[in-house]
């Protein structure tokens, strides 16, 4: 896993949810950090903007923690390179 992607997503989540960065771990569920459904939509939009990717709604619904977000981002970046 790319540490730069991790750091960027960790910052996005911490800023969007107003939580301390050290609470945003790979396995911490966004809901456990206080995210409701609107927060999750805003997180996905912020991630899309930060990485210049598109996350379809059906995929966005599957992203519940940092690890899943990073996995999706890495896959999307790899696809753009092809």
UniProtKB/Swiss-Prot annotation:
GO terms, biological process: lipid A biosynthetic process
Classification via SUPFAM superfamilies: ACP-like (SSF47336)
One example GO MF annotation: acyl carrier activity
Major location (coarse): plastid
Post-translational modification: 4'-phosphopantetheine is transferred from CoA to a specific serine of apo-ACP by AcpS. This modification is essential for activity because fatty acids are bound in thioester linkage to the sulfhydryl of the prosthetic group.
Residue ranges of every copy of the Carrier domain listed in the record: 3-77
Pfam families given in the database record: PP-binding
Disulfide bonds: none
Keyword terms, alphabetized: Chloroplast, Fatty acid biosynthesis, Fatty acid metabolism, Lipid biosynthesis, Lipid metabolism, Phosphopantetheine, Phosphoprotein, Plastid
Similarity comment text for this entry: Belongs to the acyl carrier protein (ACP) family.
PANTHER family referenced in this protein's UniProt entry, alphabetically: ACYL CARRIER PROTEIN, CARRIER DOMAIN-CONTAINING PROTEIN
Functional note: Carrier of the growing fatty acid chain in fatty acid biosynthesis.
Protein name according to UniProt: Acyl carrier protein
Species in which this protein is naturally found: Gracilaria tenuistipitata var. liui (Red alga)
